[in-house]
């Protein structure tokens, strides 16, 4: 390759007699994934120019020229008129080239004073992540809202609740749907907590030791929407725990979506028959005409593994790096950008899928008592009559054994069979051997009784609204 000067898409060159080999450049180039930082490069460069002016390193005229050039560069990036060239090493070199093209090397070449790619990229990446996770949070609230809307539409529907994937106790369908909304809300809580650590600006840290040019990192941090400037320049330029934490939060969100997806996949099978998928959110088979496949749910389940891989790969990259900056850290962006991209595909698709599900509530109600799911109610009825739970548990289990041997439900046992198990099992026990009674009786906070589930839904809706407001507010107002 020809001489690789600092005005040709790279930010270094004077110390070298020639440019890198083709293989070296191919390994080093990063514009194919770091170009997402270009709009943030403009914002940070404008803030940096103002600080250079305050430090009397830029004249009034040069500042005005530079800001105008950066504004034009930002517009050209936004509308696609300016982009990276094959000779650009990274987004930073490309953007400097673009600025110099617009304002000339005398003014454009002054912008780099007091900053390094090390503090620059750490700052821009944080800015991008802060915006990206707000979009993810907003999309997550929409999925929560879809679950809540289905819960409201089926407030009285009863279904089999399961543990170990076996029949356990009857619950409200709304209760089950809101049980998927809760972890999604916690995922947004994690995003908001993560943002506290993202909101620290590395700008002004230089390569690792800070700057001798009397710059003002706090002013840049404030203009860019950060809460503070970094306390330690070595840490600020070389740490990527914010990236691995982001990867974890996004992977956890994907895992929570995958659990919902798994239930949808099971529920739409003929064996369950709980739901029917909308044609708009399912696919067919190339050979079997009857098929209606839950591809949205399956892709959600599959892509969750991809996000877990992004997390583990990033952790492996970070685990043994000495201080301060190392080029390994170029590998921090692709896994995060990919995880964000996958969630931006999955969230609207899962929201559409959930909001258009048709529930077969009669089928769910029919199966709710199957598997002797009222056995606990029988035992707790005995407890209310003063029987120790250990004895009540034994008696209820004996009733299940008899009913199972006869192929009937608990309520179908005769009075003689009940009293034969335990004389304290009087005919009045039949009052609790209904799925409606079982559901209504579980009225503790968080329980499946209708009144409690309505309270849960109200809290879910309030939390979702608050999270959406936070996400829409943005970082830089």
From Swiss-Prot:
Lineage: superkingdom:
Bacteria
Its Enzyme Commission number(s) read: 4.3.2.1
Listed CDD domains: Argininosuccinate_lyase
| UniProt record, GO biological process | arginine biosynthetic process via ornithine; L-arginine biosynthetic process
Pfam entry (one): Lyase_1
- A GO term from the CC aspect: cytosol
SUPFAM superfamilies, per database record:
L-aspartase-like
Q: What are the record keywords, sorted?
A: Amino-acid biosynthesis, Arginine biosynthesis, Cytoplasm, Lyase
**Presence of the UniProt keyword Transferase in the record:** no
Alphabetically, the GO molecular function entries are: argininosuccinate lyase activity
Q: Where in the cell is it found?
A: Cytoplasm
Pathway listed? Amino-acid biosynthesis; L-arginine biosynthesis; L-arginine from L-ornithine and carbamoyl phosphate: step 3/3
* Catalysed conversion reaction: 2-(N(omega)-L-arginino)succinate = fumarate + L-arginine
Listed NCBIfam families: argH (TIGR00838)
Q: Which family does it belong to?
A: Belongs to the lyase 1 family. Argininosuccinate lyase subfamily.
Q: What is this protein called?
A: Argininosuccinate lyase
Its organism's taxonomic lineage begins at: Bacteria, Bacillati, Actinomycetota, Actinomycetes, Mycobacteriales
């Amino acid at each position: 390759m020809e001489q690789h000067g600092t005005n040709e898409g790279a930010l270094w060159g004077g110390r070298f007699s020639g440019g890198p080999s083709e293989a070296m450049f191919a390994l080093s180039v990063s514009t194919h994934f770091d170009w997402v930082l270009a709009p943030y490069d403009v914002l940070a460069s404008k803030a940096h120019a103002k600080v250079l002016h305050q430090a009397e390193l830029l004249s009034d005229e040069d500042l005005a020229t530079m800001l105008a050039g950066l504004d034009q560069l930002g517009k050209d990036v936004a509308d696609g008129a300016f982009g990276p060239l094959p000779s650009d090493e990274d987004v930073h070199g490309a953007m400097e080239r673009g600025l110099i093209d617009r304002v000339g090397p005398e003014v454009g070449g002054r912008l780099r004073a007091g900053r390094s790619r090390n503090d620059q990229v750490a700052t821009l990446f944080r800015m991008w992540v802060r915006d990206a996770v707000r979009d993810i949070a907003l999309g997550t609230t929409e999925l929560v809202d879809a679950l809540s809307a289905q819960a409201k539409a089926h407030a009285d529907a009863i279904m089999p609740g399961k543990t170990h994937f076996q029949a356990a106790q009857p619950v409200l369908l709304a209760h089950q749907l809101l049980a998927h909304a809760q972890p999604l809300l916690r995922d947004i809580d994690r995003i908001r907590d993560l943002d506290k650590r993202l909101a620290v600006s590395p700008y002004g840290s230089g390569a690792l030791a800070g700057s001798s040019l009397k710059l003002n990192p706090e002013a840049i941090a404030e203009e860019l929407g950060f809460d503070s400037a970094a306390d330690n320049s070595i840490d600020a330029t070389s740490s990527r725990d914010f990236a691995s934490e982001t990867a974890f939060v996004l992977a956890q969100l994907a895992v929570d979506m995958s659990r919902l997806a798994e239930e949808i996949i099971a529920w739409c099978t003929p064996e369950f028959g709980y739901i029917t998928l909308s044609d708009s959110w399912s696919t067919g088979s190339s050979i079997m005409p009857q098929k209606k496949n839950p591809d949205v749910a399956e892709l959600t389940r599959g892509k969750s593994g991809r996000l877990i891989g992004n997390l583990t790969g990033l952790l492996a990259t970070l685990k043994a790096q000495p201080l301060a900056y190392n080029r390994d850290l170029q590998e921090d962006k692709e896994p995060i950008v990919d995880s964000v991209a996958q969630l931006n595909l999955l969230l609207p698709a899962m929201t559409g899928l959930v909001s258009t599900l048709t529930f077969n509530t009669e089928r769910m109600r029919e199966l709710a008592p199957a598997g002797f799911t009222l056995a606990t109610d029988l035992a707790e009825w005995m407890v209310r009559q003063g029987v120790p739970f250990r004895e009540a548990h034994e008696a209820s289990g004996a009733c299940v054994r008899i009913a199972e041997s006869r192929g009937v439900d608990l309520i179908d046992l005769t009075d003689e069979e009940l009293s034969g198990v335990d004389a304290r099992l009087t005919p009045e026990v039949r009052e609790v051997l209904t799925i409606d009674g079982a559901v209504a009786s579980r009225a503790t906070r968080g329980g499946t009784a209708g009144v409690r589930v309505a309270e849960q839904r109200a809290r879910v809706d309030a939390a979702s609204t608050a999270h959406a407001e936070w996400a829409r507010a943005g970082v830089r107002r």
